[in-house]
Amino acid sequence: MASKFKSPLHEMVSTTPTDLWNDSCSIHELTYAIEHGAVGATSNPTIVYNVLQQELGLWEDRIHQLIEENPNWSEVEITWKIFEEIGLKGAELLLPVFEREAGKKGRLSIQTNPANYRNAEAVAKQAVYFDSLAPNIQVKAPVTQAGIKAI
């Protein structure tokens, strides 16, 4: 007998009060997760690095375009721009969930640069910028003295 559920994940979110968050902003993984009931996703530098390893073909042209358009940018600036764009793509995929749930679900969690863990001003500036990118982005900041001050 065929199951009415698409997967064990779909069964879990359909039969329990569990909210499923995808621990990746990979386009392929997140698309699958949303189709099976996920209501959120997270990103951070390590996750985005793994996404690039898995989905480089989806991002390689954009990386080259950014380098070409911004010849004076450092590797760090290019990296953070790609980090931002991958996070934005995840937020875009989750936007229908965000709208359906009136903002209570459907969020993409994006992390500020952990290298700024001692710099409250830099954490706050990046957090405000990330928050401006999409209505369903929530920002993670380091729980350090500077991070708490930034919050």
Describe every region a protein language model picked out:
Residues S3, S24-I27, T42, K81-L88:
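Electropositive phosphate-/nucleotide-binding environments in soluble metabolic enzymes
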Residues S7, S24-E29, A33, L95:
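Short alpha-helical segments and helix-capping/turn motifs at coil-helix boundaries
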